[in-house]
Amino acid sequence: MNIKTRFAPSPTGSIHIGNIRTALYSWLFARKQGGKFLLRIEDSDLQRSIDDTVELIVAGMRWLSLDWDEGPYFQTNRFSRYNSIISYMIQHDMAYKCYCSSERLESLRSNQIKNGEKPKYDGYCRFKSTDIYSSSISSYVVRFCNPQDGVVIFHDQIRGTITFNNKELDDLIIRRADGSPTYNFCVVIDDMDMQITHIIRGEEHINNTPRQINILKALRAPIPTYAHVSMILDNNLKKLSKRCGTLGIMQYRNDGFLPEAILNYLVRLGWSHGDQEIFSIEEMIKYFDLSRISKSPSILNLEKLLWLNHYYINHLPIDYVASHLSWHMHQQKINIQNGPKLTDIIKLFARRSRTLKEIVNNCLYFYIDFDLFDNKVAKDYLKPVAITPLKFLRKKFSNIVDWTPEIIKSIIIETVNEFNTSIDKIGMPLRVALTGTNCSPTLSITIHAIGQSRVLERIDQAIRYIST
C-alpha cells in the first residue's frame, strides 16, 4: 500500500497547537511509512473562510519544517468536481433534492425534542416526487440517501472498534441552497480523489466518520484507516479555541519559541516512547506509532514548553539558534551590525533565557545607546560617591591595548583594591552606567562585548548624569 496522509485545516481562524499536533502526527506517520503527506485547505464554507488565514497556515507549516509532498489544494477550486459527483448521485438515487422550508424543519425539530427524540431530518422529500415542487419552489438543498438500517463499523487506530447505528443518522445535506457543497461531502470526495489511506484528525470528527464512510461506500470507494486524536485542554481544562489569538502557532514564534521545542512538546502531548522526553525529528520519525497515542485528553503546560525551549536554545548548533534570533532582532528593528555577533549574545544569555524574546529584551544595550537615566536603578546606584571610581575605571579602560575579558576583570579588581571597598560598590554603578540595568551577564564579559569606545562613552555619560 502506498501510504498517504493529509493535513486539511479550515481557514476560519489561526491554526493553534492542537491543529499543528494533528499535522505533526500525520506528517510523522507518512515519513515513517515512506509515504506522502498532503496539504489541503478546506475552504468550502465561503462565509466563514478568512483570506489571510491561508498565509498563516502555510507560514506556520514552513516555520516548523513540516513539508508537504502535494498541495496545497483548495476546495474552492474543486466545486465543479463536487457538483458533478452530486449530479451523478442524484441520477443514481444516491441523493435527492430537498425542498423543505426552514419553518417545517424547525417545527420538526421542536416536536422531536418535545417528544424526547433525537433531532434529525425525517426523510420527507426522500419519499416524495420532486416534480410537485420544481415548478413552485426554486430553492432546495441536496441530501445524501443514508442507509436506513444496519450499522457502520470502523476500527480506529487509537480508540479501537467504533460502531454507529444507521438509524441514528439522518440524510446529510451535501449541497446547500446557495449551491455550495458542504464540508462533510467535500472532504469525502477529496480523500477519495487524492487517494488518502490514513486520516489522522481530532476526536471531534468521530461523529462525522460514519456519514463519510456511508458516502464512500455508496460511491464504491476505498475506506481509509482512521485515527482520532484526543483533544488538548487549556489550564482551565477547557478545549482550546481555534479563534483564541494567543494560541495561534505563529504567536509562539513571536513569543520566542524555537520550532524544535514546539514539535518536541507537541509530539509528547499524547504520545510517548518510554520515559524519553527529548526527541530529534529523526527520533520522532523512527519511534512514532499510532498505537502509542493516548485516548485521554492532554493538558497544555506552558512551563514544560518553556523548559524544552530553554533546552533547545542551549543545545542546538549556535549558528542555527542565531539565525532564529536574527529574525527576532529584525522584528524589533534592531541593527545587528551595531553590536556583538549574535553567537556571542547567545553565549552570554542562553543559560538564563527560556525564550529568544527574553534574549532580545535583555541584550538591547549592546546595540542601542541610551541617553537617559531616569529609572529607579540609576537613582539607586549612580550617586556622587561613584564618580571617582568611575573616572578611575575610565582611565584604566582607555589605556587597554588588548581588549579582553581577562584584562577588564583585572582592572575591576584593581579598582576594588584601590578604593578599599566591595566588588558591589564598584561593579553595580559600573554595570548600571554601561547597561542601564542592574542585571547582566558576568560584568567583564559584558563590558568586553559592549566594546571599548562605547564603554568609554557610557561612563562619560553616567558621570555627567551624576554631576547634574
UniProtKB/Swiss-Prot annotation:
Residues that coordinate or bind ATP: K242
Catalytic activity: tRNA(Glu) + L-glutamate + ATP = L-glutamyl-tRNA(Glu) + AMP + diphosphate
One of the protein's GO biological processes: glutamyl-tRNA aminoacylation
Matches recorded under PROSITE patterns: AA_TRNA_LIGASE_I (PS00178)
Major site of localization recorded for this protein: cytoplasm
A cellular-component GO term for this protein: cytosol
Motif 'HIGH' region, residue numbers: 9-19
Keyword terms: Aminoacyl-tRNA synthetase, ATP-binding, Cytoplasm, Ligase, Nucleotide-binding, Protein biosynthesis
Localization (cell): Cytoplasm
Entry's Gene Ontology molecular function annotations: ATP binding; glutamate-tRNA ligase activity; tRNA binding; zinc ion binding
Pfam family name, one: tRNA-synt_1c
Motif ('KMSKS' region): 239-243
EC number: 6.1.1.17
Family (UniProt): Belongs to the class-I aminoacyl-tRNA synthetase family. Glutamate--tRNA ligase type 1 subfamily.
HAMAP family referenced in this protein's UniProt entry, alphabetically: Glu_tRNA_synth_type1
UniProt function note: Catalyzes the attachment of glutamate to tRNA(Glu) in a two-step reaction: glutamate is first activated by ATP to form Glu-AMP and then transferred to the acceptor end of tRNA(Glu).
Assembly mode: Monomer.
Protein name (database record): Glutamate--tRNA ligase
